[in-house]
Amino acid sequence: MKEFPMCPDCAKEYYDPATRRYDAQPVCCNECGPEVYLIGREERGRDAIIYTRRTIAEGGIVAIKGIGGFHLCCDATNEEAVKRLRELKKRPAKPFAVMAKDLESVKKECLVSEEQEKILTGHQKPILLLDKKEDGEETLCESIAPGNPKVGVMLPYAPVQLLLLSLIHISE
């Protein structure tokens, strides 16, 4: 956390043994902590999240820095966006995984057993290969997993992903 020097209020809590944040490395607040921003743009914080979400909704592709590196993201219901992502990645047929907002969203498209539900919602947040419902809402485009009866699904595991997905239905 060297890159984020603490403000006086956070430093006070960090060095006071009587507080719950005593000697906790990630102590920070909106004044001194990390922030969400876009490279090459002025938006910060919530505005950056809204701009990114709008870009995805309009068929754009964005790179999102997460815990384990970068991942490319587009709207999995937009056939043209997914095809463009396939071209960029030079990945003509290998299935893509999708990130769903929540378990309810997954269940609209896929069959989910109790065991799969536990795995999907567990703390590890793996990509789980699930059977597509024959009578599902079919909002995912075919290009996600061409000719495949299964789709790789995961739930958000990083704060930035949760923020992006929480704004899906917010009127902008």
Where do the protein language model's features map onto the residues?
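Cys/His-rich short segments
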Residues: M1-G45
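Gly-rich Lys/Arg/Thr-decorated short loops/hinges at beta-loop-alpha junctions or inter-strand turns
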Residues: E31-L38, K65, L140-N148
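A short, well-structured juxtamembrane/interface segment
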Residues: G45-I56
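Glycine-rich N-terminal segment of FAD-binding domains in flavoprotein oxidoreductases
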Residues: I56-E58, V62-F70, C74
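A phosphate-binding glycine/aspartate-rich beta-alpha loop in the early core of alpha/beta enzymes
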Residues: G69-T139, S143, N148
